[in-house]
């Protein structure tokens, strides 16, 4: 029985030496008492081991020698805490642990959800269900807002300028191609006139199409070159519109992210100042830059008229939009205006290697429209193929009379009757 008790005690001491457990967080007032208790525990612990080693000499003989277990100084403290039965000591330490538990429960655990929510940006939560380009624009605006510390309206303005500046090389390339198309327009008109003079038969159509293809290849453009600007500006405007509208709906800080009279960016402008400014800036941009790169194109006037009408309709159409959208729209209009004014300067055109267009002759308006000419050629080609599939049937002289008008048929019938009467009268005589 004594052997089992000794073995169990020593195994527990060995485990506590390797894995010491601290169940008490001492206070400043307990330092002296803890040091006294530690010295007492070490003395009692060594005397206890000495007594056990004397009484259990048989166990040491069986094992081939005395069992030495080197223990750390903390094991005496742990042993004393488990083996001590001093009154009042454990209750005070338990009180300390209960106080710590209350502090953790009341303050720390309540702050964890708030800290976790603050770690995730409100824009990230708003853009979680958005399409990738729209979410990327929202993150771009948020990055500008985070790194610069600007208000939301200024962050939208800066993000608009950065993204529109990145599209300038594409706009310059589109302007070069449009200018090349204007330069080759007289040659296209000469090909069209040549095709009309030759009767627009199948051989002439094939030759004209071949010449046009070679001409487009020579200048490095396509018939859809004037639409490149629409392909660039259209999707960009739609993505910006959807991104800012989503942020105005789901980002709470937009309610105080404005300035002057538009402090709340989530509501429409009750004074209608921003819609009017948007329409005016767009109209000025149209008047200054609508025909840039479209010289010699008869569609330029139509495009300018449509843009004027759209500028006037902008005010009533945008009255219900959030004010955050106008921070982008007005900035984009001003950027387009400045870009058009700069790109029209001869020095800038020379530096960017944009070819100059020859001035049109006075009193003569170009009448060639590329798209209408292509449509006419396509329609004539289809008619020609249908005629080849259905060859004309030979004309029957008997059936040709059926194609005459009813009046001519009546006249011929009367002539035959008159001739018949004359023959009958001559026979009677």
Curated annotation (Swiss-Prot):
It is a multi-pass membrane protein. Residues 164-223, 291-309 are mitochondrial matrix. It is found in: Mitochondrion inner membrane. Residues 378-429 are annotated as: Disordered. Residues 138-142, 245-269, 331-429 are mitochondrial intermembrane. One of its GO terms (cellular component) is mitochondrion. One of its GO terms (molecular function) is membrane insertase activity. Signal peptide: none annotated. CDD domains: 5TM_YidC_Oxa1_Alb3. Keywords: Membrane, Mitochondrion, Mitochondrion inner membrane, Transit peptide, Transmembrane, Transmembrane helix. The chain crosses the membrane at residues 117-137, 143-163, 224-244, 270-290, 310-330. Expressed in stem, leaf and flower. Residues 419-429 have a biased composition (Basic residues). Required for the insertion of integral membrane proteins into the mitochondrial inner membrane. Essential for activity and assembly of cytochrome c oxidase. Belongs to the OXA1/ALB3/YidC (TC 2.A.9.2) family. This is Mitochondrial inner membrane protein OXA1. The lineage of its organism: Eukaryota, Viridiplantae, Streptophyta, Embryophyta, Tracheophyta.
